[in-house]
C-alpha cells in the first residue's frame, strides 16, 4: 500500500510482518483496517498497536495510537511479565492456595508465640508505681530530660525556676527625655512636642 508523493518518492504505510488476508482484497486507496480483522483480535505479546490510517486528499495519513491504547499495552506487557515470574494470578501448575499454609522458618530463627499474655518487650523496673510516675504522658522522654536539666541547674547554682518570667527584661535603662531635641530623628528640629514615635 504505497502512494506517490509529489517529489516522486513512495511512502510506505504498511507495517512489517504478514499482511492480513483481507488486505489483498481491498482497493489500494481504502483506509482503515479490514472489516472485523483488528477490532476483534487481541494483540499478541510484543505486537504494536495498529495506527489509524485515514485518507486526506491524495495522501494517506497515519495517526499515532491514543494514550489509552499505549497504557493498556503497557499494562498487558507488565501483567504478562508478572505472570511469567509467577507473581500474578494462579498458574495452572500451582497447587490450590486456599488451604492452610505451612510456614517454614530459616535456620537459626525461632517462631514467636502469639499468645496475648506474653510481652514482646520487658521493662526492668522495681515497682509499677515508678513506671507510672516516670512515664506519665506521651511526652515522657521530654519530661524526663526536662527534670534532669532542672535538677542539674539547681545543683550548679542557677535558680531559673525561682525567678518570675513576667519582669521586664530591659537590661539598659531608657534615657530621660530631658533634652530639647528629639532623640528619634532630626526632622522636627528640636521641637519634641510635635514628634511622635511610631
Swiss-Prot record:
Keywords noted in UniProt: Phosphoprotein
Stretches for region Disordered: 1-58, 83-146
Any Pfam family the entry gives: FAM219A
Signal peptide: none
Statement: the UniProt record of this protein carries the keyword Metal-binding: no
S-S bonds: none
Protein name in UniProt: Protein FAM219B
Species name: Homo sapiens (Human)
Species lineage: Eukaryota, Metazoa, Chordata, Craniata, Vertebrata
Gene name per UniProt: FAM219B
Amino acid at each position: 500500500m504505497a502512494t506517490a508523493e509529489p517529489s516522486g518518492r513512495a511512502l510506505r504505510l504498511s507495517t512489517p510482518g504478514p499482511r492480513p488476508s483481507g488486505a489483498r482484497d481491498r482497493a489500494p486507496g481504502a483506509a482503515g483496517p479490514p472489516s472485523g480483522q483488528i477490532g476483534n483480535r487481541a494483540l499478541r505479546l510484543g505486537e504494536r498497536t495498529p495506527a489509524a490510517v485515514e485518507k486526506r486528499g491524495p495522501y494517506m495519513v497515519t495517526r499515532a495510537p491514543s494514550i489509552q491504547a499505549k497504557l493498556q499495552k503497557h499494562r498487558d506487557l507488565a501483567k504478562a511479565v508478572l505472570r511469567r515470574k509467577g507473581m500474578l494470578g494462579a498458574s495452572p501448575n500451582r497447587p490450590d492456595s486456599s488451604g492452610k499454609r505451612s510456614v517454614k522458618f530459616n535456620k537459626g530463627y525461632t517462631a514467636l508465640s502469639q499468645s496475648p499474655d506474653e510481652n514482646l518487650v520487658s521493662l526492668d523496673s522495681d515497682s509499677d508505681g515508678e513506671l507510672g510516675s516516670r512515664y506519665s504522658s506521651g511526652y515522657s522522654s521530654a519530661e524526663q530530660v526536662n527534670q534532669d536539666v532542672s535538677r542539674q541547674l539547681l545543683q550548679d547554682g542557677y535558680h531559673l525556676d525561682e525567678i518570675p518570667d513576667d519582669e521586664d527584661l530591659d537590661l539598659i535603662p531608657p534615657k530621660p527625655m530631658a533634652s530639647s531635641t528629639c532623640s528619634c530623628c532630626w526632622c522636627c528640629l528640636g521641637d519634641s512636642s510635635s514628634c511622635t514615635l511610631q
